[in-house]
């Protein structure tokens, strides 16, 4: 007999294709996927809004730290598309902030927001992050120690 327990299916699965070859960044991306799935699971389970909004706040904070780490790495390696990449980060932060404010006002997080999180992160990793990772790994030896030192400061 069924116990009434609903197992939520993850909104976003981590896939090998998301691995960039920068261990620290890959781990942070896995954490972002995990946070998105925690929010999704909280929605599916009809958790209290305070739980859902706390998770969104956690996602916002983690994302800001992650973006700062990525942007520092890009600056340190003189990544030529830095401004464009940083703008993508800023647009993401603005959209999440807007959606969160709307959700707090209405008491409901839109499914569009969840799909946006999943789609944006997947595409951003596969396209934009892949470009800067490939760029920074071209001078791998020189940048590895730089990258390790950088991430000890952030995480």
Set out the residue ranges of the language-model regions:
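Small-residue-biased structural context
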Residues: 3-155
């Amino acid at each position: 007999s069924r116990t009434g327990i609903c197992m939520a299916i993850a909104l976003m699965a981590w896939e090998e294709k998301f691995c960039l070859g920068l261990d620290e960044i890959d781990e942070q991306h896995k954490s972002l996927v995990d946070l998105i799935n925690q929010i999704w699971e909280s929605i599916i389970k009809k958790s209290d809004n305070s739980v859902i909004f706390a998770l969104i706040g956690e996602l916002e904070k983690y994302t800001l730290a992650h973006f700062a780490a990525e942007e520092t790495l890009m600056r340190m390696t003189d990544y030529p598309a830095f401004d464009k990449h940083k703008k993508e980060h800023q647009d993401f932060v603005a959209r999440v902030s807007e959606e969160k404010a709307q959700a707090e006002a209405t008491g409901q997080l839109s499914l569009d927001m969840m799909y946006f999180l999943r789609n944006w992160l997947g595409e951003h990793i596969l396209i934009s992050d892949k470009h800067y990772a490939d760029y920074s790994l071209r001078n791998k030896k020189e940048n590895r120690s730089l990258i390790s030192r950088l991430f000890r400061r952030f995480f």
